[in-house]
Design a protein with these regions (language model features):
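Long, hydrophobic, well-ordered secondary-structure blocks that form the structural core
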Residues: 10-20
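Conserved polymerase palm-domain catalytic core
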Residues: 22-125
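Electropositive, glycine- and tryptophan-enriched low-complexity nucleic-acid-binding patches
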Residues: 1-9
Length: 126
């Protein structure tokens, strides 16, 4: 299981949109108090679930899965039904899809926090 950044709230036990909203409000108050005025950038990944590359997703998941049986099962979850949904994308509504999407974007989160060193970074998925 990947280590999500502290400000990740989607599909994580005892988190969610309400806690995310409270977290953001609290962080904005701290930022305003310490730094004054600031800008907020709100982005959305258009048709995100429909554009997830299943090969990339599977590669990411395999970093966290050691058991060969579980890898095969995960591969089935991702690739079975490709004839219905096409070459890219994962089904919307499946809990596994929501969790997989969180893991998929965790790569971006880690890059933004660890490589770019963005101090105040927040996202909500799902």
């Amino acid at each position: 299981v990947p280590k999500f950044i502290n400000s990740s709230f989607a599909c994580i036990i005892d988190r969610g949109t309400h806690k995310a909203n409270n977290y953001i409000q609290h962080q904005m108050q701290i930022f305003k108090r310490n730094y004054g005025d600031f800008w907020v950038l709100k982005c959305d990944i258009r048709r995100f679930f429909y554009n997830i590359d299943p090969n990339i997703l599977y590669h990411i998941l395999c970093k966290y899965i050691g058991d060969p049986y579980l890898k095969r099962f995960t591969k089935q979850l991702i690739f079975d039904g490709r004839d219905i949904i096409g070459d890219v994308g994962i089904p919307i509504g499946n809990y596994t899809s929501q969790y997989f999407a969180n893991i998929y974007l965790n790569e971006l989160d880690q890059y933004v926090k660890r490589i770019l060193k963005v101090k105040f970074y927040r996202q909500i998925y799902g």
